[in-house]
């Protein structure tokens, strides 16, 4: 089996795209006509919720698959519906994998080593059950929080090596208050630089045949100045770049995120794709999402070519 980074590069070349569709759907943003179409008064509200969430997101995936290399499922938008949401997440993960898309779990997980191992078992590896190992999810990669240090990251890295999976560590995020901690100085370096250096160390043993590490970084699209420095520290890592569009990141700034080969990034867009119907004159959300993903893909390609 190919390393995660090699599989990602294959998909990028095949699709001529570095775009990731973020699946961050809340039921209140699903069009009313779609809810009415699937709402069954003979079923419980929970059953209707699960059906509508799955069917809406499934159609989004179908609509954008031509223009994206993968999908990123934001855990919070499924956790808010308790275990019912995770039932939907499990089905959508399988659905996207069957579409040959790269599938990322955006859970920003971490904890002390034993707990981190549980998270890694769930989303990257295998979980021991009655003397055998069971794989519950088929994600290709996961986002993690580095705050607990190496022992909290180690289980994820080990599973990346063993199962050819990927890891994206939070380094410099797109939210306005990211500077509260990430821009603090440690021995004349910003804290985000120190974290990036750790990411480089953690990824040394997870390098694919194309020369890229399977351990990458999350760097917000609003952080172009930081991105320049992070790219110097991580010359052969993929950067997962959220925050273009609604969050204020500019497509034209992506040139500061790519490596010397104009590679090394995947760019997430969520609301501009999954709720694109709000910005188009017609009400066909599938067509709107297709057109939005195509437009974003082309804009990104123009910016980094």
Curated annotation (Swiss-Prot):
Active site (catalytic residues): 108 (proton donor)
GO BP of this protein: 'de novo' pyrimidine nucleobase biosynthetic process; 'de novo' UMP biosynthetic process
Entry superkingdom: Bacteria
Pfam families in the record: OMPdecase
Reaction(s) catalysed by this chain's protein: orotidine 5'-phosphate + H(+) = UMP + CO2
InterPro entries documented for this protein: Aldolase_TIM, OMPdecase_type-2, OMPdeCOase_dom, RibuloseP-bd_barrel
One Gene Ontology MF term: orotidine-5'-phosphate decarboxylase activity
Regions annotated as coiled coil: none
Pathway stated in the Swiss-Prot or TrEMBL entry: Pyrimidine metabolism; UMP biosynthesis via de novo pathway; UMP from orotate: step 2/2
Membrane-spanning intervals of the chain: none
Leading EC class: lyase
Enzyme nomenclature, EC number: 4.1.1.23
Keywords noted in UniProt: Decarboxylase, Lyase, Pyrimidine biosynthesis
Keyword flag S-adenosyl-L-methionine: no
Alphabetical list of Gene3D superfamilies matching this protein: Aldolase class I
Family: Belongs to the OMP decarboxylase family. Type 2 subfamily.
Name of protein: Orotidine 5'-phosphate decarboxylase
Gene expressing this chain: pyrF
